[in-house]
């Protein structure tokens, strides 16, 4: 329990100390935000701060801080330390700069910003990667909540394949509506209800877990290295922990969500609460579910091997909350987490493609032109992943590492932004290089031979993969420093204002 409480303290203190430091480095001021300087009535719409905070939390907190940490706590008590440290030093920094740099550049997404800060060549790679990843997010966050609907806790003995597909259809229809209509008409109105349910569900699971905190494992200071070898299947912490637990530590998906809220904020000075603070809250949610996961694995060790995250979640909830109405509320809360990330992932994809094609989104026709093909592709992936016995596992694995590559892209933008302004760029560069190392190591090492059920990778020897990944991270870090310095010397360059000269005139110029 002591290790768990230390982790919680790191998160809370981190917000008030390191979060304040990061805010000072950026330097929010009184300039007009996109919602006030260039409103469009669809995406750049002024909204109250409390709504923005709630929307940001619901957008970023998908199933990662629940199912991801339930699976990730298999690595042992070290998770209670690495999760909050990674959150404060990496994830919250990532989310803050994703939102604030976007706010300074008319609310543009990372692919558009990468044209400005990284160059046209890298931007094409970023655009491809993020588009694919967002489609995968939409598919994963449709299938998982539908599977949670189709559990005994919610439907008793009526669990069936038909019910699962009905749930998929209903969720997918909602996604279309929330992607297509103006943000204040659907998301801005329904999210307060979702937020209230999420808060109640989080409190319920926390109250259910508190009496069992005394069974939690502790970090072993007498034998430090033993903390790195706790996984029952022998998975190495590097890179597997940081791929398994994305949301909670750092998640590239968040960089696609922060710009959505950057378009609706009315002042830069609330950015730390909205972007940095909500990542801290997600970390706290992750800590609660990690504690629950460790408890249920102690009670039922058989769940450590073979049980899916959804299965472990169902058993945990029914065990710590035996009263049916409350256990139903908790599962509904988890479903909300998934749905409120799935809807905005597809909305973000629509905006990303629109920015890079120049299609104005005030037109109903233009929104349909982008939304319909996106949803058709996502539907095909959902159908395939559920018809193939290994389909969802394959989908989840590719989503996991592509999600972390998105984090690298966003941190690259943040590093160059800060370097070009001659500010402390190390706060973004260090987590950027670390996540580059993690994702490169994962891709180079992972394979069905090296890790059961893993996607195809290069399958290199573990130590060889580590060395190459370290070199990759160093090379990227050098490039970012050089790029940032060169931009700082470029005549007419302004990191805080969109400059059409750096683009191919395919992105609508900020007004």
Where are these regions (language model features)?
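Loop-to-transmembrane helix boundary motifs in multi-pass membrane proteins
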Residues: 120-124, 161-169, 277-286, 294-297, ...
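Extracellular loop-to-transmembrane helix junctions
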Residues: 2-19, 72-102, 111, 122, ...
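Hydrophobic alpha-helical segments and their helix-loop junctions in multi-pass secondary transporters
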Residues: 138-142, 146-157, 162-166, 174-179, ...
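Extracellular/periplasmic helix-exit of transmembrane alpha-helices
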Residues: 208-222, 276-315, 386-390
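Membrane-interface loop-to-helix entry segments
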Residues: 5, 9-27, 129, 145-149, ...
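Hydrophobic, membrane-embedded alpha-helices of multi-pass small-molecule transporters
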Residues: 47-64, 206-215, 225-289, 329-341
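Helix-loop-helix module between adjacent transmembrane segments
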Residues: 10-11, 15, 56, 90-106, ...
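Membrane-interface "cap" regions at the ends of multi-pass membrane proteins
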Residues: 10-66, 240, 270
């Amino acid at each position: 329990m002591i290790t768990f409480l230390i982790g919680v303290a790191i998160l809370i203190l981190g917000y008030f100390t390191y979060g304040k430091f990061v805010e000072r480095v950026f330097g929010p001021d009184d300039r007009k935000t996109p919602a006030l300087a260039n409103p469009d009535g669809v995406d750049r719409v002024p909204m109250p701060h409390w709504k923005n905070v709630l929307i940001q939390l619901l957008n970023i907190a998908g199933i990662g801080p629940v199912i991801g940490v339930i699976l990730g706590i298999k690595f042992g008590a070290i998770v209670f330390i690495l999760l909050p440290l990674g959150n404060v030093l990496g994830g919250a920094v990532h989310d803050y700069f994703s939102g604030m740099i976007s706010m300074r550049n008319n609310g543009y997404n990372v692919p558009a910003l990468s044209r400005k800060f990284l160059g046209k060549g890298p931007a094409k790679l970023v655009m491809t990667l993020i588009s694919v990843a967002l489609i995968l997010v939409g598919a994963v966050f449709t299938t998982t909540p539908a599977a949670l609907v189709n559990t005994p806790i919610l439907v008793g003995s009526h669990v069936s394949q038909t019910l699962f597909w009905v749930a998929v259809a209903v969720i997918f229809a909602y996604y279309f509506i929330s992607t297509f209509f103006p943000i204040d008409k659907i998301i801005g109105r329904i999210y307060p209800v979702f937020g209230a349910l999420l808060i109640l569900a989080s409190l319920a699971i926390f109250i259910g877990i508190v009496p069992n905190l005394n069974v939690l494992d502790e970090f072993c200071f007498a034998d430090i290295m033993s903390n790195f070898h706790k996984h029952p299947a022998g998975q190495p912490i590097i890179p597997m922990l940081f791929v398994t637990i994305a949301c909670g530590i750092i998640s590239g998906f968040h960089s696609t969500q922060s710009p959505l809220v950057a378009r609706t904020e009315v002042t830069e000075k609330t950015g730390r609460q909205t972007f940095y603070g909500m990542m801290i809250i997600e970390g706290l949610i992750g800590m609660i579910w990690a504690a629950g996961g460790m408890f249920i694995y102690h009670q039922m060790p058989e769940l450590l091997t073979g049980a899916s995250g959804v299965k472990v979640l169902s058993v945990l909830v029914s065990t710590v909350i035996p009263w049916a109405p409350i256990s139903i509320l908790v599962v509904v809360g988890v479903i909300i987490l998934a749905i409120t990330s799935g809807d905005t992932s597809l909305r973000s994809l629509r905006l990303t493609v629109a920015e890079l094609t120049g299609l104005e989104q005030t037109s109903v026709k233009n929104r349909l032109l982008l939304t319909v093909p996106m949803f058709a592709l996502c539907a095909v992936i959902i159908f395939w992943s559920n018809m193939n016995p290994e389909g969802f596992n394959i989908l989840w694995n590719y989503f996991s590492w592509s999600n972390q590559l998105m984090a690298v892209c966003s941190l690259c933008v943040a590093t160059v932004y800060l370097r070009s302004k001659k500010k402390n760029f190390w706060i973004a560069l260090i987590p950027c290089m670390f996540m580059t190392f993690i994702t490169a190591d994962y891709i180079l090492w992972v394979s069905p031979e090296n890790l059961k059920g893993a996607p195809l990778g290069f399958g290199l020897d573990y130590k060889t993969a580590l060395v190459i990944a370290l070199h990759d991270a160093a090379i990227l870090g050098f490039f970012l420093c050089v790029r940032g310095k060169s931009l700082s010397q470029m005549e007419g360059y302004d990191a805080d204002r969109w400059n059409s000269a750096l683009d191919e005139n395919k992105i609508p110029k900020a007004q």
